[in-house]
């Protein structure tokens, strides 16, 4: 945010958006599902969204609940990712959005 302000963009022109989707990849090595795992390309589309490489938040949650995906949280990047069945998906959830909003509004020059 500070960089945009330094570039001359007034705070009143900056808005914060919330993404309720994830970007998904088919991984090359299913036994290695951490951040940075090699990807072969976009994962097949979700059951409802049907767009390769794109999962709706509800599809990610359903996959986690059904045990098809396992959620992990990257404390450095402050974002979750989920993996399973040769798929790796990065997304935002309540925890990551809470941390990002808190950071945006409590830094030295908050919005």
Protein language model features and the residues they cover:
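A Trp-anchored, charged/polar loop motif used as the substrate-binding/catalytic surface
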Residues: 1-5, 14, 94-98
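A general structural signal for short secondary-structure junctions and capping/turn motifs
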Residues: 5-8, 102-106
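Loop/turn elements at helix/coil->beta-strand transitions in domains of secreted/extracellular proteins
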Residues: 9-15, 107-111
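Glycan-binding loop/region signatures in secreted carbohydrate-active enzymes
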Residues: 20-103
């Amino acid at each position: 945010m500070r960089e945009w302000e330094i570039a001359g963009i007034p705070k009143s022109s900056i808005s914060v958006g919330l993404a309720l989707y994830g970007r998904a990849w088919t991984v090359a090595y299913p036994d290695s599902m951490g951040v940075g795992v090699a990807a072969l390309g976009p994962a097949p589309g979700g059951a409802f969204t049907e767009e390769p490489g794109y999962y709706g938040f509800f599809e990610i949650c359903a996959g986690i609940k059904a045990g098809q995906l396992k959620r992990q949280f990257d404390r450095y990047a402050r974002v979750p990712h989920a993996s399973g069945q040769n798929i790796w998906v990065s997304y935002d959830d309540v925890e990551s959005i809470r941390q990002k909003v808190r950071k945006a509004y409590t830094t030295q020059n908050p919005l």
